[in-house]
Amino acid sequence: MIPVAEFKQFTEQQPAFKVLKPWWDVLAEYLTVAMLMIGVFGCTLQVTQDKIICLPNHELQENLSEAPCQQLLPRGIPEQIGALQEVKGLKNNLDLQQYSFINQLCYETALHWYAKYFPYLVVIHTLIFMVCTSFWFKFPGTSSKIEHFISILGKCFDSPWTTRALSEVSGENQKGPAATERAAATIVAMAGTGPGKAGEGEKEKVLAEPEKVVTEPPVVTLLDKKEGEQAKALFEKVKKFRMHVEEGDILYTMYIRQTVLKVCKFLAILVYNLVYVEKISFLVACRVETSEVTGYASFCCNHTKAHLFSKLAFCYISFVCIYGLTCIYTLYWLFHRPLKEYSFRSVREETGMGDIPDVKNDFAFMLHLIDQYDSLYSKRFAVFLSEVSESRLKQLNLNHEWTPEKLRQKLQRNAAGRLELALCMLPGLPDTVFELSEVESLRLEAICDITFPPGLSQLVHLQELSLLHSPARLPFSLQVFLRDHLKVMRVKCEELREVPLWVFGLRGLEELHLEGLFPQELARAATLESLRELKQLKVLSLRSNAGKVPASVTDVAGHLQRLSLHNDGARLVALNSLKKLAALRELELVACGLERIPHAVFSLGALQELDLKDNHLRSIEEILSFQHCRKLVTLRLWHNQIAYVPEHVRKLRSLEQLYLSYNKLETLPSQLGLCSGLRLLDVSHNGLHSLPPEVGLLQNLQHLALSYNALEALPEELFFCRKLRTLLLGDNQLSQLSPHVGALRALSRLELKGNRLEALPEELGNCGGLKKAGLLVEDTLYQGLPAEVRDKMEEE
C-alpha cells in the first residue's frame, strides 16, 4: 500500500495563506486531492494484485489476431443443450513458473503503455498541478512578500486602532438618535471580537445599559499607551511595505505564468487521455517466441484491472475537465480586469477617509485576491493607508505622553516676562496644551503640519505665539480669537513665502518677527505680503536675504517704532523707503553688507537707537549728519572694519551709548571727550595703544570697556569720571594701576585679568561699591592686597 500521508507535504501550506486563495483555487485544490486519490488507488491496485493472466492459444495461426481471444468473451447460452454433455478441458502441460514467465513477458510486450502506466501518470500530473498552484507560496522572490503581507494584514485586522478609527468615522457620518444607537451597537460588536471574557462582559454590560452608551464615550474605543505605540509601528510597516511592493509586479506575473502552465498542462492531458483511453481492453492477444520453452507461441491474456481502470480514466478525465475550466476562468479574470490597480473608492465613501490612496502593481493584485476571500480585510487594512488616520493616532499618542501635569513642568518665564510653554520636535501638537489656560506664550519648534483645533480659544491669556519651522493651519473661526489676543508673533521658516497668510491679518499684533529666505530670483525684489491690516504694529523684525527694504514696510510707517533687518551678509542696496518711517525710534541693519552709513537714516528725526552691527564699514565720515537725529542716544557700530573715528564726533552731544568694539581702531580722537552725555563707551577688541586725556571730560560715563587692546598705561584724567561703575581693562599690557583709582567711589566692577600688573594699589579699598565678586584679577594679585582691604571687599 502507498500511504496517502506521504503526499501530504505537497499540499501543506500555512493556514494564513487561505486569504490569498479565491474560490477557484480552493475548488482546484479539492479537485487535485480527488485526482490524487484516483492515482494512488490505481497504483495500489497495480502493485498489490496480478497485472495480467495469460493462457496458450491451441489454434495455430501464422498471423496472430484477437479473433480467437474474442471468442472467449461472454456470449448467449444456446437454447438447446444436451442434458448429458461431457465438458472436457484442454491440458496445456505448463507448470506455474512457465505461466508466471508468460504473464510477465506478455505484460511488457503486448499490453499498451497507457494501460500499464495510467495510475502513475495520474499521480505525476496531479503533483505537477499541485506544484504549479503553490509555487508562488514557496518561491523566495514571492513567498517573502506574501508572508510579510499576510503578517501585516492580520495585525491590521486585529488592531484596536482599526476598530476605533472606523467607529469614530461611523459616529461622525451618522446623525440623530437612531444613528447614535447604531454606532454604539457597531462599537460593541467590534469590541466583542477581542480576546478574553472581559470583552464579552463589557458587551453584556453595554447592551444592558443602552442609554449610557449614547451619553458617555465607550471605554472599548480607548487605547492605552502600549496599543498606541503598536499601531504607530504598524503604520510605519505599512508605509515601508507599500513602497517595497509597489515597485514591481513579480507576484502578478508569477500567478499568470503558473495559471498558463496549468492550462497548457490541462490541454495536453485531455488530448492524450481521450486518444488512448480506449487502449484499456479486457482481453489482450499476445504472441511471443517461447515455443521452445513452453511449446506455445500464441496466448490470450486477461488484463484483470482493465474494467476498473477504464472507469477511473473516465472519472479522471471528468475531474481534469472541471479543473481546466477553473484555470480558463482564472485566465479570464486575470486579463479581463485591471488587477495591477486597486481603488479604495468605495472604502473612502463608506468610511469618510477621503485621503486613502489607490495602490498599484503587486500591492493591488494581492488586495484583489483578498476581496475574493473577504472584502472586510481590505477595508480594515485601508485604515493604515490613511494619513488622516495616522495623524489621529499620533494625536492620541501625544495626548497619552504629554499630560497636563507634564506640560506644566515645562512652563517658564521668557525674556519678556511672559509664562511660556516651549515644545520642540514633536510629531504634533498635543490637545492637552489647550488645557493650560494660564499660558501667555506658546513656542512651537520643528513640529510638522500643525492644525490648531478649536481648543486654542481656551488659552485666554495667550499673547505671544512662536512658530519656528512649524507650518500651521488656522481655521477661520480662530483667526478672530488670535486677532483679539495676540500681541507678539514669531515665524521662522525656510522661505518667507511659507509664512501663513493668516499672520498678516492679526490686527491686534504689536510685534512681528519673520525669519526666512526669499527665493534667489525674488531676493532683489524682496516682495512681502501687505502689512496694512496690522494697525497696531510697533516692532517689525525681518531676517532674510532681501536686496532692498520690502515696500510693504511703508504700510505701517505711521506707527512702526522699531525695525530690524538682518540680511545674513547679503548686500542691502535700496534703502530709500526708510525715509517714510517717520515714527521709527529703533533701527537695526545687521549683516546687510553696508560699506557706508546709509543717508536715508539721517532723515529719521525720531530715531533714538541705531545698530549697524556686522557690516563692512571702513569710514564713518557721515557721522556728522547724525546731528539731525537730535533724539539719537545709542549708536552701535561694532563688528565692522572702522580704522578711525572722525573729529566731528563731538557734534553728537546727546549721544549716551557708543559701541565701537570689534573694529580696527588704534587711537581715539580727543574730541570724543566733548560728548558730554556719554554714559557707555565700548571700544574693546581693537588695537588701541593709548587713551586721550580728554576722556576725563566724560563726567556722565558709567561704563567703559577697554578689554582686548594694547594699552600700556591709563591717563590720570580717566579717574576724574566719578560716576564710573564698570571699568573693563582685561587683556591689555598695563604694568601698573594708578592709586587714583580709589577716587572711583561708585566702581562696582573692575576687570584686570590678562595684564602685566605686579601689584594692586591699596587705594582699591576706597572703592566702596567694589566687592570681591566684581574684581576680576589673578588670585596672586588679589592676595597681595592688604588684609583689611580684602576683608572689606569680602564683606556682604
Swiss-Prot record:
| Pfam families per UniProt | LRR_1 (PF00560), LRR_8 (PF13855), Pannexin_like (PF12534)
MF GO annotations: volume-sensitive anion channel activity
UniProt LRR repeat ranges: 508-529, 536-557, 559-579, 583-604, 606-627, 631-652, 654-675, 677-698, 700-721, 723-744, 746-767
Membrane-related topology note: Multi-pass membrane protein
Q: Does the UniProt entry include the keyword Ion transport?
A: yes
- Disulfide bonds, paired cysteine numbers: 54-301
One biological-process term from Gene Ontology?
Answer: aspartate transmembrane transport
Q: Which residues are glycosylated?
A: 63, 302
Q: Name one GO cellular component term.
A: endoplasmic reticulum membrane
Cite the effect that the entry attributes to residue 44 to C.
Answer: Alters channel anion selectivity
**Which locations, inside or outside the cell, does it occupy?**
Cell membrane; Endoplasmic reticulum membrane; Lysosome membrane
Q: Which SMART domains match?
A: LRR_TYP
**Reactions it catalyzes:** chloride(in) = chloride(out); iodide(out) = iodide(in); taurine(out) = taurine(in); 2',3'-cGAMP(out) = 2',3'-cGAMP(in)
Comment block on domains: The volume-regulated anion channel (VRAC) channel forms a trimer of dimers, with symmetry mismatch between the pore-forming domain and the cytosolic LRR repeats, a topology similar to gap junction proteins.
Please give the family membership noted in the entry: Belongs to the LRRC8 family.
Return the PANTHER family for the record.
PTHR48051, RAS SUPPRESSOR PROTEIN 1
User: What is its quaternary makeup?
Assistant: Heterohexamer; oligomerizes with other LRRC8 proteins (LRRC8A, LRRC8C, LRRC8D and/or LRRC8B) to form a heterohexamer. In vivo, the subunit composition may depend primarily on expression levels, and heterooligomeric channels containing various proportions of the different LRRC8 proteins may coexist.
Q: Report the protein name in the record.
A: Volume-regulated anion channel subunit LRRC8E
The organism named in the record is Homo sapiens (Human)
